[in-house]
């Protein structure tokens, strides 16, 4: 309850202060308007007095000029004796025109004063418009600067995130490469060991003999071209599974190139033959499966033949 009372009293006090400020603002506006009205009335009265005095002064002057002009006209008519009454009439008309022009002067002065007031008001309004325009431009620049800063922060975060992702990707590829190299090294060691020590009848050999056996294995596959897996294992005193493992390893590391068919045979394909098939496809653009098989049989020697024969077919 005490907290509610404090909140209630605070709200009442805030509303009271706001109401007082509004009332004071209204009173101030009222007195400002009243003073402005008084100043305007005083200026109008002063202008009217000044115009009246000027009018009276002009009338006297005009009267004097009219009398003098009339006297001059009379003397001129007496002396000359040749002019008629039309000259006097024209003179009177000219004097009346002068009087009308003098009477129109106060109206012109009043219009000029009003014009000066409107001009000053327009000047103040233009000044206020320029001030508002400057404030709007300043606010717009600040808003644009704020947006640019936010955009720069967002781009910086995106760049940092991208750099982190690239670093993670680099580390991942590095780990995969190390694991692959390690696995290949282990498989290579295992392959050398199986060539060096064989359970089917090979005696233990040294590293040089193991290398020779591996080289003989590769040369046998290349020369035979179409290798029967069972015959390959029997030739090197290996089990069929071991022979298949060795072929897969040599194909995986790029030493041999070929395919394993469903009849238990490995067909060795040289890089020249692969390039010839690729060239045939690129030249023909679109080929059918039958055409590809027929041309592949021509290019890929299924028996041990020299490379020059394949080159001749490719050139043809």
From Swiss-Prot:
The chain crosses the membrane at residues 4-24. Residues 25-316 are cytoplasmic. It is a single-pass membrane protein. It holds the Pfam family DDRGK. This is DDRGK domain-containing protein 1. It comes from Brugia malayi. Belongs to the DDRGK1 family. SMART domains: DDRGK. Its main location: endoplasmic reticulum. Keywords: Endoplasmic reticulum, Membrane, Transmembrane, Transmembrane helix, Ubl conjugation pathway. Disulfide bonds: none annotated. It comes from the Eukaryota. It is found in: Endoplasmic reticulum membrane. The keyword Transcription does not apply.
């Amino acid at each position: 309850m005490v907290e509610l009372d404090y909140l209630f009293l605070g709200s009442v006090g805030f509303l009271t202060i706001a109401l007082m400020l509004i009332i004071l603002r209204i009173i101030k506006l009222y007195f400002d308007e009243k003073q402005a009205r008084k100043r305007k009335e005083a200026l109008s009265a002063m202008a009217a007095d000044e115009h009246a005095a000027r009018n009276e002064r002009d009338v006297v002057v005009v009267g004097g000029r009219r009398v003098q002009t009339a006297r001059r006209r009379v003397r001129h008519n007496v002396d000359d004796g040749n002019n008629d009454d039309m000259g006097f009439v024209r003179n009177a008309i000219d004097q009346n025109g002068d009087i009308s022009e003098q009477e129109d002067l106060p109206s012109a002065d009043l219009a000029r004063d009003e014009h000066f007031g409107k001009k000053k008001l327009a000047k103040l309004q233009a000044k206020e418009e320029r001030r508002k325009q400057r404030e709007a431009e300043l606010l717009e620049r600040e808003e644009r600067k704020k947006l640019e800063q936010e955009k720069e922060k967002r781009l910086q975060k995106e760049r940092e995130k991208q750099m982190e992702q690239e670093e993670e990707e680099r580390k991942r590829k590095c780990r995969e490469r190390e694991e692959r190299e390690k696995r290949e090294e282990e498989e290579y060691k295992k392959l050398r060991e199986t060539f060096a020590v064989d359970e089917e009848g090979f005696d233990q050999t040294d590293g040089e003999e193991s290398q020779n056996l591996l080289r003989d294995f590769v040369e046998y596959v290349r020369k035979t071209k179409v290798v029967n897996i069972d015959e390959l294992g029997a030739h090197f005193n290996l089990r069929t599974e071991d022979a298949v493992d060795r072929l897969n390893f040599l194909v995986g590391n790029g030493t041999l190139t070929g395919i394993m068919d469903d009849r238990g045979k490995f067909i060795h394909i040289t890089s020249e033959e692969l390039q010839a098939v690729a060239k045939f496809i690129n030249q023909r653009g679109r080929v059918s499966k039958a055409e590809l098989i027929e041309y592949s049989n021509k290019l890929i020697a299924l028996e041990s033949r020299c490379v020059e024969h394949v080159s001749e077919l490719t050139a043809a």
